[in-house]
Amino acid sequence: MSAAATMAPVSLRIHAIAYGADDVLLFDLRAPARDGLAPFDAGAHIDLRLPRGITRSYSLLNDPAERHRYVIGVKREPESRGGSAWLHADARVGALIEVDGPSNHFALDESAPHAVFIAGGIGITPLWSMVQRLEHLGTPWTLHYRARSRRGAALLDELAGHGDRVHLSFSDEGAPSLDLAAIVAAAPEGAHFYCCGPVPMLEAFEAACVGLDPARVHLEYFAAKEAPATEGGFVVHLARSGRTIPIAAGCTILDALQAGGVAVPSSCQQGVCGICETAVLAGVPDHRDLVLSDQERAAGRTMMICCSGSKTAELTLDL
């Protein structure tokens, strides 16, 4: 089930910036007055409000038992539109950043008898938080971690102390791609499976888990799986303001609202972060996101307006 943040943003200070791997920096964020931070569960993320109106979501990688800090890993992306590029080039220790959250669309099932984690690249970050939580609970787990190289793999030092529960695989060393079907087949009975990484890995993971109880399969996308709905041809009624916005072909609902001067929080523009989640009061959404569960999609009570459209000629939103 989706979990949208409902708290007001807080100002956190960058306490430390550390090297995580090639093109990966680790940011330690703390409250300026040394106040305790809002608690979070393993798998959660926070939303950073950055300069130029940019909001970006980053997974929390530290132990959920910690109440004094949030730690995120930020990979510099070549195609960055300002999020990771600004954090790598301009963020400084001591600076304040507005933060929303935590929120969690990738929750750990703590009742499972065993957890199997599959990480690709920077996708290790939420899974490392889950590992730390399971260590406190005494629940057995295994981790399969694939990256292009050791230099580009984050958290290797932290993982080194966990012995044969951690299986590393690096493409530049000639290691074959992870055999996800074999990993799933070899897992203990009742195990839950978690995957976070690039789209091809996630699609292969979903294929390997076909036939399993969906409640045992958990995944988080960092990028869109399908194209946004830009067919247009419908209108959106804004219940609070009384405005009606036509959605033309070639733009999303979010595009049209922003062009009309309607301020709506957003970040990824791909339907993976959940920031733009909006309540639907009437009409049938055409869901294209990777946040809502199948049950939530069927209910049609909420949608991600950055990527989803409408199956009906009119859609009424709680805006």
From Swiss-Prot:
Induction: By 3- or 4-carboxydiphenyl ether and by phenol. NAD(+) binds at residues 113-223. It comes from the Bacteria. Residues 7-109 form the FAD-binding FR-type domain. Pathway: Aromatic compound metabolism; carboxydiphenyl ether degradation. [2Fe-2S] cluster binds at C268, C273, C276, C306. InterPro entries: 2Fe-2S_ferredoxin-like_sf, 2Fe-2S_ferredoxin-type, 2Fe2S_fd_BS, Beta-grasp_dom_sf, Cbr1-like_FAD-bd_dom, FAD-bd_FR_type, FNR_nucleotide-bd, MRET. Residues 234-319 form the 2Fe-2S ferredoxin-type domain. Keywords: 2Fe-2S, Aromatic hydrocarbons catabolism, Electron transport, Flavoprotein, FMN, Iron, Iron-sulfur, Metal-binding, NAD, Oxidoreductase, Plasmid, Transport. PROSITE patterns: 2FE2S_FER_1, 2FE2S_FER_2, FAD_FR. One of its GO terms (molecular function) is metal ion binding. Its EC number is 1.-.-.-. One of its GO terms (biological process) is catabolic process. Its cofactor is FMN. It holds the Pfam family FAD_binding_6. This dioxygenase system consists of two proteins: the alpha subunit (PobA) and a subunit (PobB) that acts as a ferredoxin and a ferredoxin reductase. Degrades exclusively diarylether compounds having carboxyl groups in the 3- or 4-position. Yields a hemiacetal that spontaneously hydrolyzes to phenol and protocatechuate. Belongs to the PDR/VanB family. This is Phenoxybenzoate dioxygenase subunit beta. It comes from Ectopseudomonas oleovorans. The lineage of its organism: Bacteria, Pseudomonadati, Pseudomonadota, Gammaproteobacteria, Pseudomonadales. The gene is pobB.
